[in-house]
Amino acid sequence: MSATPIGFFGLKLVPGKVHRMDVSRDFKITNVSYADQPKSNTKTLVKIHYTHVPGFEDDYDEEEQEKEPKSTDEEEEIEEKVYTLCSLNGANKDHAVVDLQFCQEELIGFSITGDAPVDLVGNYVAPPDFFDQDPSDSELYSDDEDDDEDMYGLDSDDFDDDDDDDMDEDPDRFEELVESSASKPKKAIEAAPLADSKKRAAEKPVKETAAKKLKADASAASAASTPTKAIETKGEKQTKGAKDTKPKSETVEKKTVDKSTSKMTTTKLPSGLVIEEKSAGSGPPCKAGQKVGMRYVGKLTNGKVFDQCTSGKPFYFKLGKGEVIKGWDEGVKGMRVGAERRLTCPPKLAYGNQKIPGIPANSTLVFDVKLVEIK
């Protein structure tokens, strides 16, 4: 599938200078020409300066290689190489049509020989799709994760059935279940455990109040000769039960609200991506070239879930290599293990005008993501 153009790219090259590129977005060069009318005897070579970064190569045996450290002689050095893109001359070839695409984070530069400036023009392009096949509608909307393929090409055989039993099936949230001390309050992110604790907290005061009421009624029956005292006792117990119940409920709600709001920070990047920080995580931040393992829930803006990976084997990809949509490459960068974010990706950082099963064209996508591993 050819890359989808999403914007104009242009660069003017002047003699005697190497134009270094900070490749923040994928782009393609389609035409090379003189910037002005050249002299008939003008000759120009357009050069590409490319630096290979060893950490960016596709390597599926990283863990085994880490166990066997390389010797000094085997370590790969970073070296810049220069290649010729095309040649121009003022007599009969003042432009060249090319088709050359560069990916985000590549270390490249351009230079020219001769004394005539040259224009490079082309397009910024959308990153390639990060799944190989279009899943069917039934697969996208199936609730049984053991029978479907997620949109990233992970087969159900890759998932561990034992892990499925340990994960919360709520499609809106996800969480690695961890044992915690009973004296510490649950985090607001743990949706299912918190709901159960709220339910128990609500049921307990009701049961206590009912028991106290029955006890007060029994006291009133046995002390019929002194009705005034029985009534006072009953009233005091009911009042005390109400006072005991109210602070508990308010405390649980207050802690939940405080935790959910105090950790929420929102940032909007120039690209239009909105990042909501929900949990900071710990350890070093992830960076381009590293393989990261993710949990996620993908939704449309109307709340409809189109894909998720909340249990079993995490979804792995190499950050900054265009293996996922642009919104993920930008939004996951800098996360730490355990960190959680909500990424709101405008169409240009998702699938643009492509129509995908379950995702209409020009859709804004919302992802709740959690980083669980950095390799």
From Swiss-Prot:
Q: Which UniProt keywords apply?
A: Chaperone, Isomerase, Nucleus, Rotamase
**Among the entry's GO cellular component annotations, what is one?**
nucleolus
Where composition is biased (Low complexity), the residues are 217-230
The listed locations are:
Nucleus
Q: Which reaction does it catalyse?
A: [protein]-peptidylproline (omega=180) = [protein]-peptidylproline (omega=0)
Q: What is its main location?
A: nucleus
Pfam families reported in the protein's UniProt record: FKBP_C, NPL
Q: Name one GO molecular function term.
A: peptidyl-prolyl cis-trans isomerase activity
Give start-end of the signal peptide: none
Q: Which domain of life is it from?
A: Eukaryota
Where along the chain is composition biased (Basic and acidic residues)? 196-216, 231-261
Note whether Transmembrane occurs among the keywords: no
Q: Where is this region: Disordered?
A: 55-78, 127-265
Per UniProt, the ranges with Acidic residues bias are 56-66, 131-173
Q: What does the record give as EC number?
A: 5.2.1.8
Known activity regulation?
A: Inhibited by both FK506 and rapamycin.
In the UniProt record, does the keyword Cell membrane occur? Answer: no
- Annotated PPIase FKBP-type domain ranges read 289-375
Which family does the similarity line name?
Belongs to the FKBP-type PPIase family. FKBP3/4 subfamily.
The role this protein plays is: PPIase that acts as a histone chaperone. Histone proline isomerase that increases the rate of cis-trans isomerization at prolines on the histone H3 N-terminal tail. Proline isomerization influences H3 methylation thereby regulating gene expression.
Cite the record's note on assembly: Binds to histones H3 and H4.
Per its UniProt record, what PANTHER family does this chain match?
39 KDA FK506-BINDING NUCLEAR PROTEIN, FKBP-TYPE PEPTIDYL-PROLYL CIS-TRANS ISOMERASE FKPA
Name this protein carries in UniProt: FK506-binding protein 4
- UniProt organism field: Mycosarcoma maydis (Corn smut fungus)
Its taxonomic placement starts with: Eukaryota, Fungi, Dikarya, Basidiomycota, Ustilaginomycotina
Q: Which gene encodes it?
A: FPR4
